[in-house]
Amino acid sequence: MRNVFIGSHGTGKTTLCKALKKLDSSIAIRDGVSRPVKIARDKTGMTPYQEQAVINELTKFYWEYNKDFDNIFLARSPLDVEVYSRVFGMVDLADDMENWIRTSGMLNEDVNYFYLPIEFELEDDGVRFVDVELQKKVDEELQKSIKKYNIKVTKLTGSVEDRIKQIHRTQ
């Protein structure tokens, strides 16, 4: 079964994936594609729009590619990239992703969604956005999208250890 972490940037999704992998090497983890795409942007001079378009398309591909893996945790989903596209004002990209979400069958798949709220200060890792207001806006829009798509989520809070315990209770 796929397990998907959704949340704004800097909420601990990647950290949680790494901690789960340390506890159980049989777990497959997949981080989002934003980091390598940002590196490619810096090398190629992609515009922000081009960067987001590539992130959106790769996220769709990853979603389909990881469909048949058992015991997998994803740090990003099509829902996240739809929200980022919308927050960045790239309405056509957001609308395209919304259409894909509605028509791809994604909403009918057997997936555990875990929502990670903002609980920690943003860390500057050289790739992630460090704008706290942007982080809050993305979080607000994610919560709206969860309602819009009627996605059942388990909210994870507390330390990494606390969150892992909460995950284990759902498995």
Predicted regions and their residues:
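Hydrophobic anchor at the beta1->P-loop junction of P-loop NTPases
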Residues: 5
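The conserved Walker
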Residues: 9
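Conserved lysine of the Walker
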Residues: 13
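Conserved substrate/cofactor phosphate-moiety recognition/catalytic segment
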Residues: 18-63
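A glycine- and Lys/Arg-enriched "phosphate-lid" helix/loop adjacent to the NTP-binding pocket
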Residues: 89-162, 166
